[in-house]
Amino acid sequence: MVRKIYFLTLLYFALCVNTRSCTDVIMFSFLDKTPTEFDLILDPHKLQNVAFFTNEEFKVILKNFITDLKKNQKLNYFNSLIDQLINVYTDASVKNTQPDVLAKIIKSTCVIVTDLPSNVFLKKLKTNKFTDTINYLILPHFILWDHNFVIFLNKAFNSKHENDLVDISGALQKIKLTHGVIKDQLQSKNGYAVQYLYATFLNTASFYANVQCLNGVNEIMPPRSSVKRYYGRDVDNVRAWTTRHPNISQLSTQVSDVHINESSTDWNVKVGLGIFPGANTDCDGDKKIITFLPKPNSLIDSECLLYGDPRFNFICFDKNRLSFVSQQIYYLYKNIDAMEALFKSTPLVYALWQKHKHEQFAQRLEMLLRDFCLIASSNASYLLFKQLTQLIANEEMVCGDEEIFNLGGQFVDMIKSGAKGSQNLIKSTQQYRQTLNTDIETVSSRATTSLNSYISSHNKVKVCGADIYHNTVVLQSVFIKNNYVCYKNDERTIMNICALPSEFLFPEHLLDMFIE
């Protein structure tokens, strides 16, 4: 299309020139474009309802403000600052030290502190040619301030240790540099230890990308240019580590095969669904780090195969390295006849499938892949998983009126297969749907319950993280020797191997198959 328009333009231009006499001279001139300039508005009269204070003025205001707040006899951190100030100033004995300033702050839409010295706020910002010299700080409307915010501002503006000498041994964890506390600088992943001790900045690049899910195994297809940028040449048969952060599970890091994208303008990342459940990944803003591995490097390659590749290491503790996501489970449930026909082509697979016929479909699939790996090999389970993904390659799901209005249809099969949800979820959703807008009592109690469960689950995540770390540290020192479970050394025996629960041992139903 562009080429066609360009050609027509040239044709038109040629015709115009031909219609003139040969003596005519056509002149072209280019006008200078006026440069765009950005000015910082520091004149308070040009802005509506803004409270301007210089750095020095604001320091004094904060000091007086906190002094007044300390006089509050009924201190409650959940009260707004306005409530706390009303409590203070209704007491006749307390005199407001700065009534004009306070009125100015409350009436304004925002507070701007000007003439700031160079500090942590500014150093963190990346500046470019369009950025002014940022020597101001914009604070939100006073209604959004709370007690903690004021204390934080006071620490930032009225810091006692600005130019003092401090005792390193005691204050190492408290000294603030332009980028934060020294302790963090030594320990954090972007601190001195990483950037300066290695005498180089590591070649990292991060970007936001749309994730397109591949109905596949442990495979990824990153943007073509990211592979080219790393290797500097065309490569094939490349491996990469994919790690989800925070990585609290052994399966957060997995080895993936890198497929080269044919398109050079496709900036999406395509990820195989097999590694999603293990790493607890979803596509709502999760952070995933893709680490390309040097090629050729046979040592790293062999490590990948030994520790992270489902072809050679399908089971990781009590989980499979590859699992199906709920939509795939539903599709397989729909195609159960075709799937069982595939199993019958390999008698061993069908025998294992029949072993767990009383289990729900989703659990049955997991158990089949695990058992097949233990009896045949990791690679056998990997290939079976791959075959099953190909079986449902062209499936799709479309919701109609039955699903939208009655929560029936495909939802019923999805619950039956064990892919997602439960009958109770459907029941409670229908119950919630019937709630009236005017039923304030019910809505408010649900909101409170929801908030409380959110807070408690947030706490649980932190506690679980600590527990997982603790268990890992302890279990690293546990090993089996001479039919005893030992801790740290051979002499420190904890118990006989017979006391181990059956979950730690080879599954009994598979041993029975060999004995029979």
Curated annotation (Swiss-Prot):
UniProtKB keywords = Transcription, Transcription regulation
Which protein family is named in the record?
A: Belongs to the baculoviridae LEF-9 family.
Task: Quote the InterPro entries the UniProt record gives.
Answer: LEF-9
According to UniProt, the name of this protein is: DNA-directed RNA polymerase subunit LEF-9
User: Which Pfam families does this UniProt record tie to the protein?
Assistant: LEF-9
The alphabetized list of GO BP terms reads: DNA-templated viral transcription
Role noted for this protein: Component of the viral DNA-dependent RNA polymerase which is composed of four equimolar subunits of LEF-4, LEF-8, LEF-9, and p47. Plays an essential role in late and very late gene expression.
Q: Which domain of life is it from?
A: Viruses
Quaternary state and interactors = Interacts with LEF-8, LEF-9, and p47.
Organism, as annotated: Autographa californica nuclear polyhedrosis virus
